Design a protein with these regions (language model features):
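Alpha-helix capping/hinge segments and adjacent helical runs
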Residues: 1-71, 167-189
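Predominant activation on well-ordered alpha-helical scaffold segments within soluble catalytic domains
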Residues: 7, 11-15, 54-58, 70-73, ...
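C-terminal amphipathic alpha-helical interaction region
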Residues: 63, 78-198
């Protein structure tokens, strides 16, 4: 997740930055076009997204009977426990808890038949959902730190951080449901196509 998820979604952020500037975004008057080109290389440097996703679902979350996932879950739950006590963040803590549960259930559903071809057929949407869940945790932690430092959000940067956290929880985290649907059902729409069909 730390390698491949950012290489995919940071490029999307760069693309949106170009779009926000309109025609000017594609000129050298602003650095966003250079950022896009530089960030596009990350997807190449970090290896194939699908390979990283298959390694995550096929090996990393299963290692030592899921110990790594349990440790990550415990850290996320500790952050959620702090956030539940903050009225502005309690709903986000609950939403993150639900997302974490969905990822755990999808991990089990993917491997329900024990067939690696079925389990890994949707490794990419699994990693997208898992990555979004991890980022939701990071945003919850950022929101906690922001409110501790500036409870009234009197500093513009504090208001910006809280706005970004709200955005992620309202617009990005809900996407995991669609991604995990195909993981849960072990959908083979893409994997079942023969090479000749392409």
């Amino acid at each position: 997740i730390a390698k491949s998820w950012p290489s995919e979604f940071c490029l999307e952020a760069n693309s949106l930055a170009i779009q926000i500037h309109g025609g000017y975004g594609y000129t050298r008057d602003f650095p966003v076009e250079q950022y896009w080109r530089d960030n596009r290389l990350n997807m190449i440097h970090e290896g194939t997204h699908g390979i990283q996703a298959a390694d995550l679902l096929g090996r990393k979350v299963l290692m030592e009977n899921g110990r790594g996932m349990q440790l990550l879950s415990a850290r996320m739950q500790a952050t959620m426990a702090q956030a539940v006590a903050v009225p502005e963040l309690a709903a986000y803590a609950a939403q993150l808890g639900d997302a974490l549960q969905q990822v755990g259930a999808a991990t089990q559903a993917a491997w329900a038949t024990g067939n690696p071809a079925e389990a890994l057929a949707n490794a990419v949407p699994y990693m997208q959902a898992f990555g979004h869940t991890v980022l939701a945790w990071v945003w919850l932690d950022v929101a906690l730190a922001t409110l501790r430092a500036d409870a009234t959000l009197s500093i513009a940067a504090s208001a910006g951080r809280m706005g970004a956290a709200r955005y992620f929880y309202h617009y990005e985290l809900p996407k995991i449901g669609a991604w995990l649907n195909v993981v849960n059902s072990r959908d083979t729409t893409c994997a079942a196509l023969s090479e000749a069909a392409f």
